[in-house]
């Protein structure tokens, strides 16, 4: 369905291939979801984090599919469904019909649930106009704390603010995922790409928040030395071919990966700044 606002948002992207078009539609839809959440006041009690946050607000040069949110304080009675109408209304303004459903985690396989806490609710946003596109939203209602946030501006579909984790805390979440995530019996290359981005941009790692994540997710009282050991072990033993294959569909320039090797990432680990 043609819509001036939606089409204008899409026009900022390279739509040459079907994969590029799919990635662009994903990202425009993600921004529409953020606009809906802002309209209902969601960011008064929650913050955006993860790879999609890094992509939208900090220019990460890869596309990202899922959307991760953390409450600012633990609240096991938090009801995300009250934000559904605002998300639906945001899409209706650009001529799109969406459906939002809470997923039953009892139906998750071991792989899907391996990195998902009991206190994380999962929702799927599906689209009538793009049947193949489904955006998964995760909301951690009992999150690891000791993180900082900031307000970040988006101008489309209209001007609004999104509360986001600061970069050092985004980095902490990514490093926890890189070291501990078990994902389809292989590594998630997107974690590695993001790790490279943080080091290249000289972002310090908030170890206090990282330690909080390790304690809550893994019941580990981690020290900096032990974490470095775990990181080096993961980086030096992973199958780099699998790492590259996972991230390729989300890349604008695949040649960026030519230099990737186990040694390359081990050297990156030595460049991580701790705060």
Map each language-model feature to its residues.
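Short glycine-biased active-site loop of nucleotidyltransferases that positions the nucleotide triphosphate
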Residues: 55-63
């Amino acid at each position: 369905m043609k819509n001036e606002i939606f089409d204008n948002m899409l026009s900022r992207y390279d739509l040459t291939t079907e994969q590029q078009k799919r990635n662009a539609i994903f990202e425009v839809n993600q921004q529409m979801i953020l606009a809906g959440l802002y309209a209902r006041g969601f960011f008064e009690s929650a913050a955006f984090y993860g790879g999609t946050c890094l992509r939208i607000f900090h220019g990460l040069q890869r596309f990202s599919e899922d959307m991760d949110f953390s409450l600012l304080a633990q609240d096991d009675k938090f009801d995300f469904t009250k934000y559904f109408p605002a998300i639906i209304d945001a899409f209706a303004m650009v001529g799109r019909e969406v459906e939002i459903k809470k997923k039953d985690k009892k139906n998750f396989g071991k792989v899907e649930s391996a990195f998902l806490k009991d206190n994380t609710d999962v929702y799927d946003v599906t689209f009538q106009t793009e049947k193949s596109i489904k955006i998964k939203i995760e909301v951690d209602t009992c999150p690891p704390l000791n993180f900082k946030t900031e307000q970040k501006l988006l101008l489309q579909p209209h001007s609004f603010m999104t509360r986001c984790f600061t970069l050092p805390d985004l980095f902490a979440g990514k490093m926890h995922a890189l070291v501990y995530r078990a994902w389809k019996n292989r590594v998630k290359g997107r974690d590695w790409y993001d790790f490279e981005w943080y080091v290249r941009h000289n972002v310090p790692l908030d170890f206090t928040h990282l330690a909080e994540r390790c304690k809550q997710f893994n019941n580990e009282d981690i020290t900096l030395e032990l974490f470095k050991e775990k990181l080096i072990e993961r980086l030096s033993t992973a199958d780099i071919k699998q790492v590259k294959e996972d991230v390729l569909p989300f890349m604008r320039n695949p040649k960026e990966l030519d230099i990737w090797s186990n040694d390359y990432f081990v050297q990156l680990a030595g460049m991580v700044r701790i705060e």
